[in-house]
Curated annotation (Swiss-Prot):
Belongs to the C2CD4 family. It comes from Homo sapiens (Human). Residues 305-421 form the C2 domain. Keywords: Phosphoprotein. Residues 13-97, 119-140, 158-228, 250-303 are annotated as: Disordered. Residues 215-228 have a biased composition (Polar residues). SUPFAM superfamilies: C2 domain (Calcium/lipid-binding domain, CaLB). This is C2 calcium-dependent domain-containing protein 4C. The modification Phosphoserine is found at S262, S264, S273. One of its GO terms (cellular component) is cytosol.
Length: 421
């Protein structure tokens, strides 16, 4: 019995030792298995050595400085970890040192540039510009003396006048339009010079006089006169237009003088507006008749107890077309009617059958609406014109909630509108 107990105790002691050994082995295995999982965690024993490189020394002392400093621990680790890397070129530090030297010299260099006064004068001198030379010859242009003893323009004449003194493109205009141009041309001819180029701009003399009002009676010089400076390039076309207008007015005045034998005060100052020229050139329309090929007539049609419509009817037999020109409507609204509620509209059609219905535009806020519209009725032969009638219907258009109001209605035979048919 005693032997059995001792054997049992020995077995328990052996199993305990084996379990402890197994526990130590399992813990080591767990640590080995968990090690790679936390390898990215930075711990104090894993902090690497950092190295801040010094400034590159100048000259050949670079190798001595590196030898004095010695390799650091991080450099040793890198060298041991990557032995297969190619070594640095020995010429690279020298090249970097040379570049740093050149940069330092460029940064500390003070550049002093000396420009020649003659070069500045040749660029900025007044005599270099031919147009400025012409301005310098004018006594009316203010001038100033420079520190070198040269004369230059005190200010630009562009800021004083719209017509520039420096535009020499149409220099002949200044010589032709100036008051002393005739004297200069006479002197040139007396001296034997050719006055052809100066006479070439003589055709523009009348536009210049028309534009400025003629020769000045005052004793102003050619330089102080506006004609002493050349005009702009676009002024030539304007002067030509003025020349044509002036010639047309002269011909009209001559015609009026020959017709009446005298010139009144109103005829001496004709209106220069485009409308007046159109009125002067417009011919009176021929009187309608059987021989004119067209039948027309203007009528006032009463469409209600007090309202009326004025219109003009014209029939073209060659095209079989009737044209009705609606002029205006009168007497349709009284004074008590609110002008804001007026929306007048006229409708036209041919009866019987209500053929070719047409409607005018709506005229608002006017007690005497003016239309001035044309209405065309095509395909009407002479036989149809004698049978048909024109229906005129005047309506005041209502708003969104109101109905249209009939102001008047009238039917007229076309034979009554066309008396010469």
């Amino acid at each position: 019995m005693r032997k059995t107990n001792m054997w049992f105790l020995e077995r328990l002691r052996g199993s305990g030792e084996n379990g402890a050994a197994r526990g130590v082995g399992s813990e080591a295995g767990d640590k080995a298995s968990k090690g790679p999982l936390y390898s990215n965690v930075l711990t104090p024993d894993k902090i690497p050595d950092f190295f801040i490189p010094p400034k590159l020394p100048s000259g050949p002392a670079e190798g001595e400085g590196q030898a004095a400093l010695g390799p650091s621990t991080s450099e040793q680790n890198l060298a041991s970890a990557a032995p297969r890397q190619t070594p640095r070129s020995p010429r690279l530090p020298a090249k970097l040192a040379a570049e740093s030297k050149s940069l330092l010299k460029a940064a500390t260099r003070h550049v002093i540039q000396i420009e020649s006064a003659e070069d500045w004068l040749s660029e900025e001198a007044t005599d270099a510009d031919p147009q400025a030379q012409g301005a310098m010859s004018l006594p009316s242009v203010p001038k100033a003396q420079t520190s070198y003893g040269f004369a230059m323009l005190a200010e630009s004449p562009h800021t004083r006048r719209k017509e520039s003194l420096f535009h020499s493109e149409h220099g002949a205009l200044a010589q032709v339009g100036s008051p002393g141009a005739g004297r200069r041309r006479a002197a040139a001819k007396a001296n034997g010079g050719d006055g052809g180029p100066r006479e070439a701009g003589g055709a523009l003399m009348s536009p210049g006089r028309y534009f400025s009002g003629g020769e000045s009676d005052t004793g102003s010089s050619a330089e102080s006169s506006p004609f002493g400076s050349p005009l702009l390039s676009r002024s030539v076309s304007l002067l030509k237009g003025f020349a044509q207008d002036s010639q047309a007015k002269v011909s009209q005045l001559r015609h009026s003088v020959g017709r009446h034998g005298s010139l009144s005060a109103d005829d001496s100052t004709p209106d220069a507006s485009p409308g007046s020229r159109r009125r002067l050139t417009r011919r009176a329309p021929p009187e309608p008749g059987p021989e004119s090929g067209q039948a027309r007539g203007e009528h006032t049609v009463h469409v209600g107890p007090r309202g009326s419509v004025r219109l003009l009817a014209e029939y073209e037999a060659g095209q079989a077309r009737l044209r009705v020109h609606l002029l205006a409507a009168e007497g349709l609204y009284d004074r008590l009617c609110d002008a804001r509620s007026i929306n007048c509209c006229v409708g036209l059609c041919l009866v019987p059958g209500k053929l070719q219905k047409q409607r005018s535009t709506i005229v608002k806020n006017s007690r005497r609406p003016v239309f001035n519209e044309d209405f065309f009725f095509d395909g009407l032969g002479p036989a149809s014109v004698r049978k048909l009638a024109l229906r005129i219907k005047v309506v005041n258009k209502g708003s969104s909630l109101k109905r249209d109001t009939l102001l008047g209605e009238k039917e007229l035979p076309l034979t009554s509108l066309l008396p010469f048919l």
